Amino acid sequence: MAEILIATERNEKGKTARKKGFIPGIIYGKDREGQSINFERGKLIAFLKEKGEKSKMNFQLNGENKQGIIKEVGRDAVTSSIIHIDIQEVSALEKVRWTIPIFFEGREQLKKKELYIQVYLTEVEVEGKASDIPNNITLNVGNLELGEEVKVKDLNIGSNIRIFNELENTIAIISSSQNTNKNIEEEDPSEVE
């Protein structure tokens, strides 16, 4: 069963909540007004480290189990510590538009072949039922060869999920890790007047 985080109603300012060890936030949805909430700092940070900052989450508010998607994680400009979170409450069957991250695995295999991955796109915008949308897309690039590329159209996330990015957009290209500037001609200083 997925971890359920406890949210509590917040009546104080965000700064006060942070001093008490909470991360303040707001929850909103199709049939609800925005509501100020708090999450216990340590538990929310552990959840975000494990699931990511653009994931679905199960939480409890006033004894009621709810599901939401993380829309934004606010960070302090100097320390980059988390200072706020915005959550859109959704039902499993509700259609939502959401940005999900792309993760790459298999970089070690590429390195053994003296190849590396040039990443051009790290997330895609999708729409579908909340229950059908994955928290992320993981691409295994370990078996790809020099010059091969992955495009948005190559993603396999289900026919019931609409992707808003251009299908021909390049996600990543496999390149050589060797120096590609072999034939750089140096200017002869004696030719300069």
From Swiss-Prot:
The keyword RNA-binding applies. InterPro entries: Rbsml_bL25/Gln-tRNA_synth_N (IPR020056), Ribosomal_bL25/Gln-tRNA_synth (IPR011035), Ribosomal_bL25_b-dom (IPR020057), Ribosomal_bL25_C (IPR037121), Ribosomal_bL25_long (IPR001021), Ribosomal_L25_dom (IPR029751), Ribosomal_uL5_bac-type (IPR020930). One of its GO terms (biological process) is translation. Pfam families: Ribosomal_L25p, Ribosomal_TL5_C. It comes from the Bacteria. One of its GO terms (cellular component) is cytosolic large ribosomal subunit. Keywords: Ribonucleoprotein, Ribosomal protein, RNA-binding, rRNA-binding. The keyword DNA repair does not apply. GO terms for molecular function: 5S rRNA binding; structural constituent of ribosome. HAMAP family: Ribosomal_bL25_CTC (MF_01334). NCBIfam families: bL25_bact_ctc (TIGR00731). Part of the 50S ribosomal subunit; part of the 5S rRNA/L5/L18/L25 subcomplex. Contacts the 5S rRNA. Binds to the 5S rRNA independently of L5 and L18. This is one of the proteins that binds to the 5S RNA in the ribosome where it forms part of the central protuberance. Belongs to the bacterial ribosomal protein bL25 family. CTC subfamily. This is Large ribosomal subunit protein bL25. It comes from Clostridium tetani (strain Massachusetts / E88).
